[in-house]
Amino acid sequence: MRSLVTEEVGDAKVAGNPLIEVEHLSRVIGSRLQKTVILDDVTFSIPAQSLFAINGPSGSGKSTVLNMLTGIDRPSSGRILFAGQELRRMSENALARWRGQHVGIVFQFFQLVPTLTALENVLLALELGGGGKLRRRDWRERAMDCLEIAMVKDRAHRLPGALSGGEQQRVAIARALANNPPIIIADEPTGNLDSRTAYQVFDTMAGLTRQGKTVIYVTHDKDMAARASARIDLLDGHVVDQHMANAIVVEPQPVMEVHS
């Protein structure tokens, strides 16, 4: 399987060191007269090169945490540090640039452009993200490498409608890898898949940590959450449990490096 070599991101890039630190995070919506607390004083850290799960039932606040980790939403109080850099202090433009350079997002419902092939969907991500510091003439090779990592290279020229749900999610993973971000964030990546396909997609994501990626995923599935190397359990906007340093259950695969 091919590998995209992740660039260094300060001292926190060393495996096991905190890459992301969430401190006393709260999110409150509504007016002064009628407030709704979505998150209340949430604190946790995400180790570099970990497979990190945010687990909880519907309404627990896990999607809100995800949106704040990607910079889509701002916290009411508290802060998020990425390799020591505080996201809340960034302007909207700076935050958008940061997100484009550092985060690849995998959506629950794939969000592939239906009129573009799998390869073209990945190439579009390169176009929108600036090409991951590659020359344009190298984009196609990078896109094919990403599809190979996600194990759908043989589906490169098919439209999403001709792919199974699991294959579409793998293309979405390839797209998230296109600009070689150090962080992959996935929103219920196995939620719409049958159990066998879900575990196959999970193993693909877990394998990315061996290539230097930090993979963060939201799930309501306790079995999927338990397979992570670290996780938090949310309930009603609070962290009710934290689990660190579990073993990731995934079969080892040979890696062939591709340097940009």
Task: Describe each region flagged by the PLM.
Residues M1-V14:
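Pre-NBD coupling/linker segments of ABC/ABC-like ATPases
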Residues L19-I20, S26-L234:
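ABC family nucleotide-binding domain
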Residues H238-S260:
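Conserved beta-strand-loop-alpha-helix hinge in the C-terminal portion
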